């Protein structure tokens, strides 16, 4: 019984500790206009990519932004060009989805044990780039993710208070036509634990 409650408490704590960092992946997001768009995370945090989305017919289908996203090495990040060996990480290819924008999520695990999954390390940086699927514009969209830890590839001597808080992408930024809002409800981690509690109690002999 004590083991059960300890496990449940550990689950609640781990869910509550994880942060979600949202990035609106489209060319009208001004954060992509800089060459060093960076998100700071910790192990077990999530990265949520919000794909381009159009809620009306003001943009021709051929001009709607659609992307293939890659997780690449630093050299490919600088060139904004994936190698043939780089497998596509995600596809943003439903710009008119009725349920709202597609959300693609990455969890920064230390070790997953799955062959096709990526293991992430503290103190390392990881790089995402995209290539357009149909539209002609070939603007480079790229993102650097730095995982907090003992070793950092790009240490800063005097990080300011804002950087210490590991900021996510600003959800209030004014992003243009390719972003919509999903009506799907979101549950906080504690709410998930409360919902799971009755089911887990039924399993106790």
UniProtKB/Swiss-Prot annotation:
Lipid-acceptor residues (GPI-anchor amidated serine): 182
The propeptide sits at 183-205
Q: Name one GO molecular function term.
A: ephrin receptor binding
Pfam families with a match to the protein in the record: Ephrin
The cellular component terms of Gene Ontology attached to this UniProt record, alphabetical and capped at eight, are: extracellular region; plasma membrane; side of membrane
UniProt KW keywords? Angiogenesis, Cell membrane, Disulfide bond, Glycoprotein, GPI-anchor, Lipoprotein, Membrane, Secreted, Signal, Tumor suppressor
Q: Which residues form the signal peptide?
A: 1-18
Q: Is Transport among the key words of this record?
A: no
- Could you tell me which cysteines form disulfide bridges? 51-92, 80-140
Known post-translational modifications?
Undergoes proteolysis by a metalloprotease to give rise to a soluble monomeric form.
What are the Ephrin RBD domain coordinates in residue numbering?
Answer: 19-151
- Family according to the record: Belongs to the ephrin family.
The subunit structure is: Monomer. Homodimer. Forms heterodimers with EPHA2. Binds to the receptor tyrosine kinases EPHA2, EPHA3, EPHA4, EPHA5, EPHA6 and EPHA7. Also binds with low affinity to EPHA1.
Q: What does this protein do?
A: Cell surface GPI-bound ligand for Eph receptors, a family of receptor tyrosine kinases which are crucial for migration, repulsion and adhesion during neuronal, vascular and epithelial development. Binds promiscuously Eph receptors residing on adjacent cells, leading to contact-dependent bidirectional signaling into neighboring cells. Plays an important role in angiogenesis and tumor neovascularization. The recruitment of VAV2, VAV3 and PI3-kinase p85 subunit by phosphorylated EPHA2 is critical for EFNA1-induced RAC1 GTPase activation and vascular endothelial cell migration and assembly.
> What is this protein identified as?
Ephrin-A1
**What organism, scientifically named, is this protein from?**
Bos taurus (Bovine)
Gene it is expressed from? EFNA1
């Amino acid at each position: 019984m004590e083991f059960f409650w300890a496990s449940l408490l550990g689950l609640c704590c781990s869910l509550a500790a994880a942060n979600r960092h949202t990035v609106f992946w489209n060319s009208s997001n001004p954060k992509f206009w800089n060459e060093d768009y960076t998100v700071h995370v910790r192990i077990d945090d999530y990265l949520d990519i919000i794909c381009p989305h159009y809620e009306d017919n003001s943009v021709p289908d051929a001009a709607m932004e659609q992307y293939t996203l890659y997780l690449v090495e630093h050299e490919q990040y600088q060139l904004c060009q994936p190698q043939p060996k780089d497998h596509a990480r995600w596809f943003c290819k439903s710009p008119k989805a009725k349920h709202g924008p597609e959300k693609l999520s990455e969890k920064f695990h230390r070790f997953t044990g799955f062959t096709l999954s990526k293991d992430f390390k503290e103190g390392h940086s990881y790089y995402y780039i995209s290539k357009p699927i149909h539209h002609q514009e070939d603007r480079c969209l790229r993102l650097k993710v730095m995982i907090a830890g003992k070793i950092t590839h790009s240490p800063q001597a005097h990080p300011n208070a804002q950087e210490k808080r590991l900021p996510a992408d600003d959800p209030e930024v004014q992003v243009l036509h390719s972003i919509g809002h999903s009506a799907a409800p979101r549950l906080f981690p504690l709410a998930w634990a409360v919902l799971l509690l009755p089911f887990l109690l039924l399993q106790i002999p």
